[in-house]
Amino acid sequence: MEESRADGRNPNQLRPFSCTRNPLDRAHGSARWAQGDTIVLAAVYGPKPGTRKGENPEKASIEVVWKPMTGQIGKQEKEYEMTLKRTLQSICLLTVHPNTTTSVILQVVGNDGSLLPCAINACCAALVFAGIPLKHLAVAIGCGVLEDGEVILDTNKAEEQQLKSFAHLVFPNSRKSASSKEPNQKEEDSERGLITSITHGVMSEEDYFSCIERGLAASSRISDFMRTTLQKQAPGDV
């Protein structure tokens, strides 16, 4: 029998999700994504003409700015920006608007654990609401490994203090299937990959693959929620 966590969830249970479309009027698209008490606002501006020095002018550029709840941005937040930029570049169709820059601004509203996955999910929704061309949707989930080897999903902040290691995983989810009840075989195959994988702490190969297996199984629940949300709130964009 699986033991309950301090908040009453079982190891595979995710916190409640919510997503609000375009809470920020001045952005081209925005989303407020919440997982329990972890809340992130993502705002998309662009595409705007021109790219920064060092960027490929034959493709669109993605710029990410992370704003913490309080204080100045630090090393961890800079790492979040880099991870988000790489992740978003991998899901956006960068050849559609060459020599342009799309800015994604993230504001942390609440942090009760699994902050980076929450931010990635917020970004994905905001990009859709802004009408940015995507190869596919993406869903992110946090997986924690306890000292006894137990894997728990969507960790809160208190749990993160007790982890031996953790993995933040981003899985692709066919963009086309967001408006399709039954994705075809090619789309189903594309959902089995891994876009981004960030690990921290001492993690064995067995623990890592256990995180991937459990995370992939749980990601379908986030995918279903995201599809339903996008169909309901912006049927023309998905």
UniProtKB/Swiss-Prot annotation:
Subunit record text: Homodimer or monomer when reduced or oxidized, respectively. Component of the exosome core complex.
EC number: 3.1.13.-
Pfam family name, one: RNase_PH
A single GO molecular function term of this UniProt record: double-stranded DNA binding
Protein name: Exosome complex exonuclease RRP46 homolog
Keywords: DNA-binding, Exonuclease, Exosome, Hydrolase, Nuclease, Nucleus, RNA-binding, rRNA processing
Location of the region described as Disordered in the Swiss-Prot/TrEMBL record: 174-194
SUPFAM superfamilies: Ribonuclease PH domain 2-like, Ribosomal protein S5 domain 2-like
One Gene Ontology cellular component annotation held by this UniProt entry: cytoplasmic exosome (RNase complex)
Biased composition (Basic and acidic residues): 183-192
Homology family: Belongs to the RNase PH family.
Subcellular location: Nucleus, Nucleolus
Gene: RRP46
GO BP term (any one): nuclear mRNA surveillance
Biological classification of the source: Eukaryota, Viridiplantae, Streptophyta, Embryophyta, Tracheophyta
PANTHER family membership: EXOSOME COMPLEX COMPONENT (PTHR11953), EXOSOME COMPLEX COMPONENT RRP46 (PTHR11953:SF1)
Purpose of the protein: Probable component of the exosome 3'->5' exoribonuclease complex, a complex that degrades inherently unstable mRNAs containing AU-rich elements (AREs) within their 3'-untranslated regions. May form a homodimer separately from exosome complexes and function in DNA cleavage process. Binds double-stranded DNA (dsDNA) and single-stranded RNA (ssRNA), and possesses hydrolytic DNase and phosphorolytic RNase activities in vitro.
